[in-house]
């Protein structure tokens, strides 16, 4: 499906740095590029260093060294030209105005991203 960057409502790009999921403000680079892999109706988001964006049992966002089953699979929900990343526990990836990445149970502006094709 190709490479994407995800820019939050607040102008922060989702970013994979080391072992953490963070955000970058204002620009995107290789840390913010995710390869979207199709997995039968769901997608996996693979980082530039080969790790997978994942949501754990306690709703934390983390990077996995391998495809970690449902923890690493998402639905991309499109809303008016934007996208939300919904995980297996029906929680959305969220980036707040401070750039903190977490999950939320409900869809709102913090869970909505501009999807940029790289």
Curated annotation (Swiss-Prot):
GO cellular component terms listed in the entry, alphabetical order: actin cytoskeleton; cortical cytoskeleton; cytosol; phagocytic vesicle; plasma membrane
Compartments, record wording: Cytoplasm; Cell membrane
Membrane topology note: Lipid-anchor
The Sequence repeat ranges on this chain: 34-46, 74-86
Renumbered residue ranges of the record's region 2 X 13 AA approximate repeats: 34-86
Region: Contains several HHXH repeats, residue numbers: 8-109
GO molecular function: actin filament binding; actin monomer binding; fatty acid binding; lipid binding; protein-macromolecule adaptor activity
Lipid anchor positions (N-myristoyl glycine): 2
Record GO biological process: actin filament polymerization; hyperosmotic response; response to acidic pH
Pfam families found in the cross-reference section: Fascin
Residue ranges of coiled coil: none
UniProt xrefs under InterPro entries: Actin-crosslinking (IPR008999), Fascin-like_dom (IPR022768), Hisactophilin (IPR052883)
CDD domains: beta-trefoil_FSCN_HatAB
Post-translational modification (record): Phosphorylated.
Keywords, in A-Z order: Actin-binding, Cell membrane, Cytoplasm, Disulfide bond, Lipoprotein, Membrane, Myristate, Phosphoprotein, Repeat
Major location (coarse): cytoplasm
Function: May act as an intracellular pH sensor that links chemotactic signals to responses in the microfilament system of the cells by nucleating actin polymerization or stabilizing the filaments.
PANTHER family documented for this protein: HISACTOPHILIN-1-RELATED, IG-LIKE DOMAIN-CONTAINING PROTEIN-RELATED
Family: Belongs to the hisactophilin family.
Subunit details: Homodimer or heterodimer of hatA and hatB, linked by a disulfide bond.
Protein name from the UniProt record: Hisactophilin-1
Phylogenetic classification of the source organism: Eukaryota, Amoebozoa, Evosea, Eumycetozoa, Dictyostelia
